[in-house]
């Protein structure tokens, strides 16, 4: 904070997870927070809202959960074994909500649907993947009714917000 006062630093941010994020937000010193969030990792949903309401910028990481069930073989995502994520996706019948979207587009647009989000970090493996991500982002958030239904199904499957 001394460096900010001296004009050497314009913005101060933190990348974090629960439970520390509540305290970090309450400190009132951060301009931006980077938080993991996706359809399959919703425990930070309320923290995003809290931080946004406090005027803190929100950067989401992991908004497509590092891929979709097809990509999860033998991987762990923020401490969640791939079997858990696959079970949530399948139990929630999220494929039924795709309506022509790819799973990646659905995940990205779900993430973009959170009203507190300012930006998201999305990885890419190829020029085609980058093009698909840009196209999905341009299409914007999912319709509210699709987000609500996805959340309802995911909650019933055990993937809940905090």
Which residues fall in each region the model found?
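Glycine/proline-rich, positively charged
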Residues: 1-39, 46, 56, 113
